């Protein structure tokens, strides 16, 4: 069975005619091998993908821009946040970043370091990054599938630059201390939707873009 995250990523690639895809954390290529992109780069220090290196080392030498980036590497909050910040600097305007494991099923799945037992899924503290991203006040949803799939779309060219200047950097100290129980308390206030709802929104947006490109709709029309 093809994972939902694969279907969502392929939908984005097809819907917006994206070509360049980056995956951080490939493991056994369950996702990577099923992604239908013209150009794919997969980064993992142990197995899978196309490059055997850490994401930090990759971003130090990378010169490419990407349309879609999927972050599913180290599941410690500070590393996920660093991967997100670095990804922003190599994401094209209008591009999309997907993040995995933002809705752990219980507090036992939401800890880091990951336990050495067979407890699955192993979400770590990835979920805390949602609060950093929400602080940006940009387009961001959490899809209620698998263990929570975050979807951030960059519509703002001014978000780029040195990661230390991003608004989210000011929230890092706060978000890293948020307990899992607190997240559960405010869960109903989070932008959590179903995948089909997000896909419908993206379809409407793409139609609008095409009408604007053809001069059939003003850019400020709503």
Question: Locations of the language-model features?
Answer:
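A short alpha-helical cap/connector motif
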Residues: 1-70, 74-98, 102-222
